[in-house]
């Protein structure tokens, strides 16, 4: 899952009478089936939080960065688990461009008192150089036309243009390196967006250090900087999706069955064991595959764990992009599970890419009302694999706890922070919701259920900054 949650803020409690003005309801098949308690029990009695926990424990022994041996080990484990439940599991490979962070970033400036801490920009290139420091404003083409940066290191302030544009503008005028300084307090972390052989070595510094350098230059002090970046690398890597399919046990042979997806992502960020992000979602996906395997359905259910989610939803994008048109037309729902087990995260929310209700939110709210007495709140949020399905026109939603835990994307995202109770709750809500729609001879959808609260999650994930 990508970047940090902010707190939930209640907008309004939706009622049946106001639903038409505040939510966009999906096509008729998207209304929820109201189950008998005995139907829910068929799913609930099979769910075992201990099994989910054990799978998380195995997966979170080490980070599972996309394209690494540890990811491949996790993929093999997931495949074996699916097979142990009686599925034919397939591994789907895809290639992607990956960037390895440098292991050394150094900046020193002769003529400047004090130490400067420099950070790299993602996709910045390696280099070992020295040169005179010259100020080039915001790094616009116009400013660089008026500044002699040839053979020099350009000092550029953040703002207006992307980091990549600033670096390329400086490179075009012959600069050998770039020092970008923040326009606000604090360190500056950012990305150049993609690999480009025209990039030159570039680092970022704080606003305080940048303004201090600029003050020296304005006072007529000549500054010479030495800049070194080592270990950065861009190259093609391979990641994987794992797919297991439960065929419909009964359906009209004249037509193909509908398809429902239950998904999670098995990769993690570098340095983080990813127990919650997202070994939890992967393990609940595995458990629901086990639970639903022998229950009769007239709907096809596909269980997928995606790779390279942390690199930009690459696995799910690859998967959905390569689905046949007929499969997309038959797909009626994607239940995406990401970060669903942390004991110190907030409450469960259901997030759609556009913030509107759809089949998934309807089914899940009906399910959570039956199980917990209240419908799970919903809101708007992207930055997880449900987006790839939503962009293909498929009703999709993310199940996640918010606000997130303090150790999100850190080495402390470990198994001891996982709550079996939260795992059980999510598995029950999603499992019964899916079975409502998938079971044979499901009742005609009934929309007479209490509506959940709509919540706002502003800036749900702080994207890597480009400007």
PLM features: what roles do these ranges have?
Residues 1-29:
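Sec-dependent N-terminal signal peptides of Gram-positive bacterial secreted proteins and lipoproteins
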Residues 38-46, 60-70, 120-124, 135, ...:
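Second-shell loop/turn segments in exported
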Residues 82, 170-171, 178, 242, ...:
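Alpha-helical metal-binding/catalytic segments enriched in His/Glu/Asp
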Residues 116-206:
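Extracellular/luminal Protease-associated
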């Amino acid at each position: 899952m990508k970047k940090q949650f902010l707190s939930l803020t209640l907008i309004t409690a939706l009622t049946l009478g106001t639903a038409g003005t505040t939510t966009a309801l999906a096509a008729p098949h998207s209304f929820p089936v109201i189950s008998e308690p005995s139907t829910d029990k068929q799913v609930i009695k099979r769910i075992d939080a201990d099994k989910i926990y054990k799978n998380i424990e195995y997966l979170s022994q080490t980070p599972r960065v996309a394209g690494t041996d540890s990811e491949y080990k996790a993929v093999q484990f997931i495949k074996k688990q699916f097979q142990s439940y009686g599925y034919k599991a397939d591994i789907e490979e895809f290639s992607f461009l990956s960037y390895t962070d440098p292991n050394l970033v150094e900046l020193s400036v002769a003529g400047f008192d004090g130490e400067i801490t420099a950070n790299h920009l993602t996709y910045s290139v390696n280099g070992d150089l020295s040169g005179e420091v010259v100020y080039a404003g915001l790094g616009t083409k116009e400013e660089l036309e008026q500044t002699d940066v040839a053979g020099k290191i350009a000092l550029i302030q953040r703002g207006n243009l992307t980091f990549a544009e600033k670096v390329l503008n400086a490179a075009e005028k012959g600069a050998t390196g770039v020092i970008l300084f923040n326009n606000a307090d604090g360190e500056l972390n950012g990305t150049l967006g993609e690999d480009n052989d025209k990039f030159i070595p570039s680092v970022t510094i704080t606003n305080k250090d940048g303004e201090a350098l600029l003050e020296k230059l304005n006072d007529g002090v000549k500054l010479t900087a030495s800049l070194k970046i080592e270990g950065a690398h861009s190259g093609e890597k391979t990641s994987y999706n794992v797919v297991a399919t439960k065929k419909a046990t009964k359906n009209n042979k004249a037509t193909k069955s509908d398809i429902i997806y239950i998904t999670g992502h098995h990769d993690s960020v570098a340095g983080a064991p990813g127990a919650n992000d997202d070994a939890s979602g992967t393990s609940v996906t595995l458990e629901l595959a086990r639970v639903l395997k022998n229950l009769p359905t007239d709907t096809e259910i596909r269980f997928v764990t995606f790779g390279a989610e942390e690199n930009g939803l690459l696995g799910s994008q690859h998967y959905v992009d390569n689905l046949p048109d007929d499969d997309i037309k038959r797909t009626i729902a994607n239940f995406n599970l990401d970060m669903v087990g942390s004991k110190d995260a907030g409450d469960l929310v259901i997030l759609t890419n556009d913030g509107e209700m759809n089949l998934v939110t309807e089914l899940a709210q009906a399910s959570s009302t039956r199980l917990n007495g209240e419908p799970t709140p919903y809101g708007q949020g992207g930055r997880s694999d449900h987006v790839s399905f939503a962009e293909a026109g498929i009703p999709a939603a993310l199940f996640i706890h918010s606000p997130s835990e303090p150790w999100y994307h850190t080495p402390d995202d470990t198994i001891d922070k996982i709550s079996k109770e939260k795992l059980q709750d999510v598995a029950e809500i999603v499992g019964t919701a899916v079975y409502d729609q998938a079971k044979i001879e499901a009742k005609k959808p009934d929309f007479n259920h209490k509506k959940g609260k709509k919540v706002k999650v502003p800036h749900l994930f702080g994207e890597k900054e480009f400007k």
